[in-house]
């Protein structure tokens, strides 16, 4: 947000935010998430923030985050993560069937990392297009809202509608525009 409001890279508040995100990156390249389940959401959020702060897509943390998202892509081209990834004895990402919202988060993260031309992004976009309903929207059975982890999870009915549209629009804009970098609206 600070970058969107015009903060420069040397702004101490922006630097503190970047330093915090870099310090919180997990060894596997992911970030923990809070409002969405879980590491897919957190990794998208962190990559969007680092991109917004002006870090180069070749920065090691951004590359590790993008590599992690690519590594956890489901064979069908989408992404999914089970709520059990919030368990206390964390052992790693918990895969689940692909969902529209988690696929969109992964795509938004990869695009923020400068990976719009990566084949994983194409596969994810194709998954969203193939699973889009006749009304132009998506449904999903799995909970993807964080709620209070390990206590209850939320089914935000807007998640599988808003986020896929955002990801597809961003993909189209990056592929047809003059820039491969996400510059506005994180």
Please identify what each model-predicted range represents.
Residues 1-19, 23-179, 184-186:
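An alpha-helical repeat/solenoid feature that recognizes helix-turn-helix modules
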């Amino acid at each position: 947000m600070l970058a969107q409001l015009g903060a420069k890279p040397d702004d101490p508040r922006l630097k503190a935010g970047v330093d915090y995100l870099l310090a919180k990156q997990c060894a596997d390249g992911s970030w923990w998430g809070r409002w969405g389940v879980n590491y897919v959401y957190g990794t998208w959020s962190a990559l969007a923030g680092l991109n917004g702060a002006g870090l180069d897509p070749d920065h090691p943390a951004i590359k590790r985050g993008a590599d992690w998202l690519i590594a956890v892509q489901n064979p069908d081209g989408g992404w999914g993560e089970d709520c059990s990834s919030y368990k206390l004895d964390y052992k790693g990402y918990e895969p689940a069937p692909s969902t529209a919202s988690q696929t969109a988060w992964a795509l938004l993260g990869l695009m923020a990392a400068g990976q719009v031309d990566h084949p994983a992004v194409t596969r994810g976009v194709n998954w969203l297009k193939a699973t889009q309903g006749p009304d132009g929207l998506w449904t999903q059975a799995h909970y993807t809202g964080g709620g209070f982890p390990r206590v209850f999870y939320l089914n935000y009915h807007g998640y599988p509608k808003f986020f896929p549209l955002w990801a597809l629009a961003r993909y189209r804009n990056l592929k047809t525009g003059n820039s491969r970098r996400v510059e506005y609206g994180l």
